Amino acid sequence: MFARLDAATGKHRQELFQQLVAELVRHEVAEEEILRPVSKHDAGEAIANARIKEESEAEGLLKEMEKLDPGSAEFTSKLAKLRREVERHAESEETKEFPRVAAKETTERLEQMGRAYEAAKRAAPTRPHPSTPNTPAANLLAGPFAAVADRARDAVRDALKSTS
């Protein structure tokens, strides 16, 4: 997705950026609801909190980027930074977090988490907005999209309960 976004121009670049935002937010909502609680226990608070911090930094960058013209040099620079941050975050998950979770959880539990993760990604909105507040009360005040995001989180939590 990053390579396609780098090469795109005009309206197509804006559309691809919106798709990237949607995919990143769906991914992070799913991780936030399913992986992080388990990770804090299995991998430790420091590792889980480092991943949360990385996600927060990427979210901040997305908020900055949404205010910019996608054709601007500043947008392109921030896009390159975002790509580096996302790649570094994924590598940290793969090398520091996932192996510790996998070592402490049963195969059945890991499969359950995988199913819940996929359900979460399907339930999450396809047009997320990175500047949406991150609390349920603020989400309700922020508008319909935010309420949908809360409903997606609730659906994920319900799915987790029904698969446990």
What are these regions (language model features)?
Residues 1-164:
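Small-residue-biased structural context
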